[in-house]
Amino acid sequence: MSNNIQFKVQPGGTIKGRIRVPGDKSISHRSIMLGSIAEGVTQVTGFLEGDDSLATLKAFQAMGVEIEGPNQGNVTIHGVGLKGLKKPDHPLDMGNSGTAMRLMAGILAGQDFECELIGDASLSKRPMKRVTSPLADMGARIDTAEGGKPPLKIHPSSDLKGIDYTLPMASAQVKSCVLLAGLYAEGETTVIEPAPTRDHTERMLNGFGYPVQSEKLDEMQTKVTLAGGGKLTAKNIDVPSDISSAAFFMVAAAVAEEADLVIEHVGINPTRTGVIDILKLMGADITLENEATVGGEPVADVRIKSSKLKGIKIPEALVPLAIDEFPVLFVAAASAEGQTILSGAEELRVKECDRIQVMADALVAVGIDAQPTEDGMIINGGLQKAQSAEIQSHHDHRISMAMTIAGLNAVSEITIDDCANVRTSFPTFIELANTVGLNVTAVEV
């Protein structure tokens, strides 16, 4: 496959139909990790066959775990127990995945073998001190490149100690890393988060029979506690559709004329539904149908119709609950009447790229008044028709997909560069986009 895939987006019709987007990336990663260190056989359905979660799968195979699949989203994991992983004979390549690297660091910190975690050029620029620092407090020994960046060289350690750790930022990845290291630590490990973040790790640990206590300290803070030395028992996992992937089509339907779209079996974990809450505050016509709980995770069909969106000041409490969805929420803001203000989102600057600056540049290129700020953006919306432009995605899958949605209401073709990384999270994106009424082609250049 060519390194440069361009998306060419023609202005399209309306958005209609029923679709199911691929499995949730966060839950897919965790199903492999916990299934591998559980005792017994775990069957996973709905697994996301994207590059990121496949990197996690291959890493555990390299550490001696027998994993069959994926075959149409079905994976069988023959767990080896907490102490059953073997030293891999090569560095473990996490590709583009910050989630994989940070969570794996927690599991590997308590092993009795040395291991190195590496990643692609983008991942190699991302901050890892946020996980290596608390792990060092627990007794782990981890070497990093300059500035606390990957690769991570993790030395053997069999005497981790539990810690009480207050997160300096709301980060599910850091919280999960510390909790996973806590499985291997003596005593209790406690993490206090300053604002709610996704809780898939805690839910899945409880599902595997490993007790985790969560206690609300106040409206924002939560304390999560587990004790080391237990065991995980295999459990089958049905991975719901990824709300982060569904978000692109939610916005597409909201901004298109005469749209009516149903996205099936979407994970609506309350720590992930910030995108729905924000769109509703903007006036989006969104309803949940067929609500159910599957394997401890709430799911529903999400129905979205054409909406007259208005600009809002996005509540900072919702920022951690929609952190991955802001690129496409910026596109919604561009179509909304009035001003949208985002603050408290400095985390966006250290994602796969600086998503604040890159999205501001992309929106300006298509004719939007978008002003980046240190921790967010100010967008003056009301755009009826986006201008034709060539957009630089900076190899960021979510920028590529967000600007594809911006092309729905353009005057003529929008070209987006460097879209190969869309396959990390949403390999069927173009196919589904064209199914519901967009007009997108991928071209190797």
Curated annotation (Swiss-Prot):
Species name: Hydrogenovibrio crunogenus (strain DSM 25203 / XCL-2) (Thiomicrospira crunogena)
Keyword Transferase: yes
Record keywords: Amino-acid biosynthesis, Aromatic amino acid biosynthesis, Cytoplasm, Transferase
Quaternary structure note: Monomer.
Protein name from the UniProt record: 3-phosphoshikimate 1-carboxyvinyltransferase
PROSITE patterns reported for this sequence: EPSP_SYNTHASE_1, EPSP_SYNTHASE_2
Record EC number: 2.5.1.19
Main location as per UniProt: cytoplasm
Function, in words: Catalyzes the transfer of the enolpyruvyl moiety of phosphoenolpyruvate (PEP) to the 5-hydroxyl of shikimate-3-phosphate (S3P) to produce enolpyruvyl shikimate-3-phosphate and inorganic phosphate.
Protein's GO biological process: amino acid biosynthetic process; aromatic amino acid family biosynthetic process; chorismate biosynthetic process
Protein residues bound to 3-phosphoshikimate: K25, S26, R30, S171, Q173, D324, K351
Gene of this entry: aroA
Active-site residues, record numbering mapped to chain: D324
4Fe-4S is among the record's keywords: no
Intracellular or extracellular location(s): Cytoplasm
Gene Ontology molecular function: 3-phosphoshikimate 1-carboxyvinyltransferase activity
Matches recorded under CDD domains: EPSP_synthase
Ligand binding (phosphoenolpyruvate): K25, G98, R126, Q173, R355, R398
Protein family per UniProt: Belongs to the EPSP synthase family.
Cellular component terms (Gene Ontology): cytoplasm
